[in-house]
Amino acid sequence: MLSPKIRQARRARSKSLVMGEQSRSPGRMPCPHRLGPVLKAGWLKKQRSIMKNWQQRWFVLRGDQLFYYKDKDEIKPQGFISLQGTQVTELPPGPEDPGKHLFEISPGGAGEREKVPANPEALLLMASSQRDMEDWVQAIRRVIWAPLGGGIFGQRLEETVHHERKYGPRLAPLLVEQCVDFIRERGLTEEGLFRMPGQANLVRDLQDSFDCGEKPLFDSTTDVHTVASLLKLYLRELPEPVVPFARYEDFLSCAQLLTKDEGEGTLELAKQVSNLPQANYNLLRYICKFLDEVQAYSNVNKMSVQNLATVFGPNILRPQVEDPVTIMEGTSLVQHLMTVLIRKHSQLFTAPVPEGPTSPRGGLQCAVGWGSEEVTRDSQGEPGGPGLPAHRTSSLDGAAVAVLSRTAPTGPGSRCSPGKKVQTLPSWKSSFRQPRSLSGSPKGGGSSLEVPIISSGGNWLMNGLSSLRGHRRASSGDRLKDSGSVQRLSTYDNVPAPGLVPGIPSVASMAWSGASSSESSVGGSLSSCTACRASDSSARSSLHTDWALEPSPLPSSSEDPKSLDLDHSMDEAGAGASNSEPSEPDSPTREHARRSEALQGLVTELRAELCRQRTEYERSVKRIEEGSADLRKRMSRLEEELDQEKKKYIMLEIKLRNSERAREDAERRNQLLQREMEEFFSTLGSLTVGAKGARAPK
């Protein structure tokens, strides 16, 4: 019999041991909801430090803290583990714990990954399966090593690019570039590249090394298939694929359109590609270009475009909910879409990303960037210099969609020079050339986008054509002035007409996004730039350049005659404006202003009407598609209900037949029982009468 003091001491000791399980991490428990979203959650078994028994707890990973709860629905956690300065280690099952999936979280930072000390402060956890344990270990390592440059497997692409920005501008993460460079150097002629799997243990070791912030180097002893499997694993474990989940249906629609009309589908696909986030755009372009290099050796490595599309399609383009029905329905479309992305990558990715910032030089400069393009021309014109230098012939394929913009400084002290202009390329197929001198030609396949370099202010006219008709040299005494000064701005010569083409924003940077967006306002766009006019007519006549219009794939066939007539009227108006100079430069003709305003108003109305009609048609088609989808769902639901009713009817018929048979059997049994009762009573009566007769003679 223990005394009360001993019992009280034991209770206090056991209570302190239990409470010690909750206070493993020193410091005050942080609020879980303030640490961001849940990175991972699930059931794990935790071993107590003293009693060594297992307790099942609900673990939640938020930020750099691992909380555990008694139940899934609990709000207040029982305890937490701070992952800063810790390491996670997988433990092999021992003789005492056979078949258990154990891992340990113990103190230790970078450089101590290979050490597994027997630390009494380590937390031993057990998962329900090997896959569950691997997922938990990867998630915890990602949290531990992400601030140190690791944990890239399963990390969002934007976060990886943002962290690696300190190493300089890159088109893809360092892991992808390292794998691609190694395969490009040693594996392009390897048979079955990307199809044959690598060594699983080596892939796992490389993944752990990259996740722990290390940068392992590949040498001649490294297996090419292992590196290829590592690259596929990185793409597969991205939380959101290269093509985001929100764009999955849009890209599948492009694939369906490609099967019907390849030209329209390619144009729509280029538009969807250009709308991707910049990190996704760069990585997709990098991978497609590399896969095109791989398929160039298909006669040796046996990996054609279709094979590469089959391997990489599900890793680059996958639905958010990966159910078997959705995957089976989209497999062929994804493969076809990936094939087009590889084959036509030079046409679809037309805006190259600059390698890095370049220092401005004293001559002509042309910089083309993803999502933006600017043509900067130095305005250091010499008096009496040559009239027009040779320029390049540039063509923009109809499938190329580039959104090009530049911001010009404004202010009371800023000047607009004719030597520095912003040019925006539309989505029409166009070309411009000078019949006398050509210094370059467009590259085949639209793999690169060449921008004309002109010594004086260039023009973009209606269908994206650059007309040199308005280029004039300023004489030696001419100087640039503001828009309200002596020299007046010509709408046709020096600025793109705002609202004429959806792909051409005005000088005030008013964007026109697709045919479904509203038209940009044209007011006030003519007063943000100045123009240079020449002083002699000989210079004007020498600067005349012809331009030719190629067929432009407009969305509506009824729009072509109006556009051609409008082009012709604009050409005549521009020629008349350039040949008929006013006698005094500071007194512009009112007729010219009225004509330009009328043409601008007409074009704006036509574009607005077309935009409105197209928007209505798209809404109607969308409503019809939604109604059709609802009807199909209702039909399928009614068919299911009809099948159920048929089954119920059959069951009722069977029950009815069974009940009839049971009733007939019951009637037969009743009749038989009635006959037996009658026989019994008759026999009983005869026996009674016989007994009475036998007693009577006595």
Swiss-Prot record:
Residue ranges of domain PH in the record: 37-145
Coiled-coil region list: 590-687
One Gene Ontology term of the molecular function aspect: GTPase activator activity
GO cellular component, one term: focal adhesion
Ranges of compositional bias, category Basic and acidic residues: 559-571, 587-597
Biased composition, class Polar residues, residue ranges: 424-436, 484-493
Subcellular location: Cytoplasm; Nucleus
Pfam families cross-referenced by the UniProt entry: PH, RhoGAP
Region (Disordered): 1-32, 373-394, 406-450, 469-498, 540-599
Domain Rho-GAP: 155-349
UniProt key word Phosphoprotein: yes
Entry keywords, A to Z: Angiogenesis, Coiled coil, Cytoplasm, Developmental protein, Differentiation, GTPase activation, Nucleus, Phosphoprotein, Transcription, Transcription regulation
PROSITE patterns: PH_DOMAIN, RHOGAP
GO biological process: angiogenesis; cell differentiation; negative regulation of small GTPase mediated signal transduction; regulation of postsynapse organization; regulation of small GTPase mediated signal transduction; signal transduction
Site (Arginine finger): 195
Quaternary context: Interacts with VEZF1.
Function: Rho GTPase-activating protein involved in the signal transduction pathway that regulates endothelial cell capillary tube formation during angiogenesis. Acts as a GTPase activator for the RAC1 by converting it to an inactive GDP-bound state. Inhibits RAC1-dependent lamellipodia formation. May also play a role in transcription regulation via its interaction with VEZF1, by regulating activity of the endothelin-1 (EDN1) promoter.
Name of this protein: Rho GTPase-activating protein 22
Taxonomic source organism: Homo sapiens
Gene, per the UniProt record: ARHGAP22
